[in-house]
Amino acid sequence: MILFMFPVFFTFSQGPLTEIKKPEVFKQMFSEATRKTQTIEADFIQEKNLSILSEKIITKGRFMFKKEKKLRWEYTDPFHYLIILNNGMMFIQDEEKKHKIDIRNNKMFAEINYIIMGCVQGNLFNDEKKFLSSFFENSGSFVVKLKPLASNLKEYLSEIWICFDKNDLSVTRLEMHEPSGDCTNIDFSGTKINATIPDEKFLVP
């Protein structure tokens, strides 16, 4: 798998990327959009590329987010798998198996929660102690490239790419690259911002 070490050649459907000359302007725009965003929901298609397999693993599902720190990530095809994050607690349901984890007492899951929430809200690039950030754009997207600086993150992530729609700054694509060469790409569609989502969707049993 080719890691995107040369961003000027990296392309999306809207054309090649160019580096943003004033990233502070983008950060300000994004901060304002985030402040106004109370909920997000979208469909997603996840594509897992494993170096040991010739075929890609494709899964589909539904994603929901609600301030503060509430997230529901539900795979519906070809299997059912549910993850709920709610104020320091993580609930996982794998078919009939159920697990509940107090993230605050588990360093590994705390990091997972940090990355998931940071990717969804797009604010990982503000953490200069943990990530080196680069900013790019084309006609339809802003793209933030993140390289982990913390040793514990480098163990399982080499790069993260977060793509934002220029119209509403919602996340449209997320790419997570691993040191092994494996890669997970997630494309979001049908995104609704500030639609009503009942709290029951985020209950941890």
Question: PLM ranges: what are they?
Answer:
Residues L3-S13:
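Hydrophobic h-region of N-terminal signal peptides that target proteins for export
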Residues F12-E55, E200-P205:
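N-terminal leader/targeting segments and the immediate start of mature chains
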Residues Q38-Q46, T59-F63, K69-W73:
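One face of beta-strands
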Residues F44, L71-Y75, M90-Q93, V144-L146, ...:
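Short hydrophobic/aromatic-rich beta-strand segments that constitute the beta-sheet cores
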Residues K60-R62, R72, H80-L82, L132-S134, ...:
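Short, surface-exposed charged micro-motifs
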Residues R62-Y114, T184:
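An acidic-aromatic
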Residues I101, L124-P205:
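Gly/Pro-enriched, hydrophobic low-complexity segments
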Residues I115-L124:
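Anionic-ligand binding region
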